[in-house]
Amino acid sequence: AGVVAMLGFVTNAMVITTQRHLSFYYGKKDVQKVRIYFSNSFLLHLCMAFFLVVVFVSLRGFLFSGYLEIAEERREIASWVYMMVIAMLVLTFISAPFKALFIAKENIWYITAVDVFDGILKFVLAITLLQLNVDKLLMYGVMMLIIMLVQFLAYSVYSVIRFSECQPTRIFKDVGKTYMLQLVNFAGWTTYGMGAVMVRTQGLSVLFNKMLCETAVNAAYGIGLQVYSAVSFISSSVQNA
């Protein structure tokens, strides 16, 4: 739950890098540069997502072979949910450039509509988990992955259809070393700050697990992260507006 709660924060942190460059060139009325920076940003986020997949999949065996205190009968389910969280992280990364494009174009209404719909789906998920007699952890992972996929499609499909700056066929043609380095240079500090927060929050969750704390302790910590994520989202929304 803690990892899922932080996905919204990760998205907002990553959007800043792309949105800064897109807004600058929108201000200069240089639509071609907007398209170029969007293409480079998307490819950069795709590479970062691939790198994280390799790292987290490599850690899977170590984490679930005894490092984390997980009941034997729940280990397989937890491992599958872990892979779903990795998939959600990938969707979060590659959706960031699209969301940045909406912010740069000041299309805040569409972002708000998507976020409200996302909240409704999560509310329905919570009610569904209470009603169905299924493995709640597995169902939670599957439904959250579907919700993340719907959110990604809402941003990406609309962008491809409505925005001339978003041209999938030109992504690799627009890639340039200079543009990529500028994005990496700015993204480095953003990623560093984002990584520090992720290590702090999820590190505490792992620490609670290793200290053999009761499940209620981790659950309370997860709820606290949900509140923190909501407050961060409100703050980011005000800044975007």
Over which residues does each language-model region extend?
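Interfacial/gating helices of multi-pass transporter permease domains
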Residues: 1-7, 37, 137-142, 178-187, ...
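Helix-loop junctions and terminal segments of transmembrane helices
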Residues: 12-28, 104, 164-168, 231-241
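Short membrane-interface helical motifs at transmembrane helix boundaries
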Residues: 53-72
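Interfacial transmembrane-helix starts/ends
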Residues: 32-47, 55, 78, 184, ...
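Membrane-interface junctions at transmembrane-helix termini in multi-pass inner-membrane proteins
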Residues: 87-114, 127-128, 138, 159, ...
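Interhelical loop/hinge segments that connect adjacent transmembrane helices in multipass membrane
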Residues: 137-143, 155-202, 211, 216
